[in-house]
Swiss-Prot record:
Family: Belongs to the ABC transporter superfamily. Galactose/methyl galactoside importer (TC 3.A.1.2.3) family.
InterPro entries: AAA+_ATPase (IPR003593), ABC_carbohydrate_import_ATPase (IPR050107), ABC_transporter-like_ATP-bd (IPR003439), ABC_transporter-like_CS (IPR017871), P-loop_NTPase (IPR027417)
Name of the molecule in the record: Galactose/methyl galactoside import ATP-binding protein MglA
Keywords from the named record: ATP-binding, Cell membrane, Membrane, Nucleotide-binding, Repeat, Sugar transport, Translocase, Transport
Organism whose genome encodes this protein: Clostridium tetani (strain Massachusetts / E88)
Broad class of enzyme this protein falls into: translocase
Length: 504
């Protein structure tokens, strides 16, 4: 009999790489029909532990027990066939195939016709329809995957896992690209899976989600097992202190900036793109952190991309230091001292195969090109080294490919890139998305220091504690319209939500 309904035990798992002890005697016990959150900063060993479970890595020590039997999977396929599935943060379905073909890829049902085995499309359709129905997903099995939303693709991956009769499903940052309604739907699916006895290993940095969905929480730090707790008795501060290894006194730096005169003024801005936002007016002061809040779909990103020159404006005016400016492209924006850190760091922020050094200076290459149109390596290297030192970028070398850095260090490189262009206004779209709690504080400190230096910050964030903790004022959008502006020190989550839903 399986003790305490435990379906999976990982006991004393250790894994060494040359010069690095990635896992040091880690334990994980997961119960049937529960959501078990696995938490830790980037580099804590969560991914390595899951790779040991899936047979991608072979552990150097320890044992894995599944359903009371000791196992050692040869590869991910072996794990899948034994009832363990994983839904990755980066979803990779086959876009130009149907939903049902993606679900049953590599194991299409076959029927005999004149002695020949051919794909039984009718059975595949019916099986997929039944599967999606059980998950309360209203999708035609014949729909091309390329036509699905992100949440529907995620649902497809869950359906695929269920089709393997998975006893355990690992979900890695499953809500990172979902709207609030889509998150609610995902949680409903997870609840149904729990009722069917499926165990969910849930990896996320989002504290409020963990406290809402998880039954138990296991925390790792520096490749070590810190402990497992029932989620019901935990708080956000307690989780963070266990993750970072110190008591949490302040999640955000103290506000020591003093906003000065108006540096940017936006008047009656309306988008040329089907009026996705309309009649937006606001002011930004020197040294101010202006937060922008709102639900997904409020058109916050569209607004800041239009200010930066990435999108066309139909009507309205932008003033910099009292002078009206026409910003038609990011090159114009840079000339007027405006920088933009985009929301999607991996796809539009970094150049993944370029080095840390190249990513640092790429926005200001004109500074390093001499009269012979040759890059002045000495001048470039000086700025690269200064940036790495000032922003405490943790990298083996400036020649390391940026894709090998953690999310927090990648974000610091993007900060350094734009700081070298000497901007007066920095627009940041979700600057801490996908970054662990320890690195978040470092990013907050950089933003705070920049505001104290007189830099003006526009910061979009979907995390209300972040908006309240960092902003001098919070501008809230709803359905493409400005619904209110609140002083940061007076803001509450309830008031932000009231304005965020004002026009819905």
């Amino acid at each position: 009999m399986v003790e305490n309904n435990i379906i999976l035990e990982m006991n004393g798992i250790s894994k060494n790489f040359p010069g690095v002890k990635a896992l040091d005697g880690v334990d994980l016990k997961v119960k049937k029909g529960t959501v078990h959150a696995l938490m830790g900063e980037n580099g804590a060993g969560k991914s390595t532990l899951m790779k040991c479970l899936f047979g991608i890595y072979r552990s150097d020590d320890g044992e894995i027990v599944l359903g009371g039997k000791k196992v050692q999977f040869k590869n991910a396929k072996d794990a899948l066939e034994n009832g363990i599935s994983m839904i990755h943060q980066e979803l990779h379905p086959v876009p130009h195939r149907s939903v049902m073909e993606n679900v049953w890829l590599g194991r299409f049902p076959v029927k005999k016709v004149f002695g020949l085995g051919i794909v039984d499309h009718k059975k595949m359709y019916e099986d997929t329809k039944d599967l999606l129905g059980k998950l309360k997903m209203n999708i035609d099995p014949n729909t091309l995957v390329s036509k699905l939303s992100v949440s529907q693709v995620q649902g497809l991956e869950i359906a695929k896992a269920v089709s393997y009769n998975s006893k355990i499903i690992v979900m890695d940052e499953p809500t990172s690209s979902l709207t609030e309604n889509e998150v609610t739907h995902l949680f409903n699916i997870i609840s149904d899976l729990k009722n069917q006895g499926v165990a969910i290993i849930y990896i996320s940095h989002k504290m409020e989600e963990i406290l809402k969905i998880a039954d138990e929480v296991t925390i790792m730090r520096d490749g070590k097992y810190i402990g497992t707790w029932e989620a019901e008795g935990l708080t956000t501060d307690l989780i963070i202190s266990k993750m970072v290894g110190r008591d949490l006194t302040n999640r955000f730096p103290p506000k020591e900036n003093t906003p000065g005169e108006v540096i940017m003024k936006v008047e009656n801005l309306t988008s040329a793109n089907n009026k996705s936002f309309k009649d937006i007016s606001f002011e930004l002061r020197k040294g101010e952190i202006l937060g922008i809040g709102g639900l997904v779909g409020a058109q916050r990103t569209e607004l800041v991309e239009s200010i930066f020159g990435l999108r066309k404006i139909e009507t309205g005016k932008i003033y910099i230091n009292g002078q009206e400016v026409k910003i038609k492209s990011p090159i114009n924006s840079k000339k007027y001292g405006i920088a933009l850190l985009t929301e999607e760091r991996r796809s539009t922020g970094i150049f993944p195969v370029l080095t840390v050094g190249d990513n640092t200076i790429i926005a200001g290459l004109d500074k390093y090109i001499d009269l012979k149109f040759v890059v002045n390596q000495k001048r470039g290297m000086k700025d690269i080294k200064n940036s790495i030192e000032k922003l405490n970028i943790r990298t083996p070398s400036h020649a390391t490919q940026i894709k090998n850095l953690s999310g927090g260090n990648q974000q610091k490189v993007i900060f350094s890139r734009w700081l070298l262009t000497e901007p007066d206004v920095l627009i940041m779209d979700e600057p801490t998305r996908g970054i662990d709690v320890g690195a978040k504080y470092e990013i907050y400190s950089i933003i705070s220091d920049l505001s104290k230096m007189g830099k003006s910050i526009i910061m979009i964030s979907s995390e209300m504690p972040e908006l309240i903790g960092m902003s001098d004022r919070i501008m809230i959008m709803c359905d493409g319209r400005l619904s209110g502006i609140i002083e940061g020190e007076e803001a509450t989550q309830e008031e932000i939500m009231k304005y965020a839903t004002r026009f819905i």
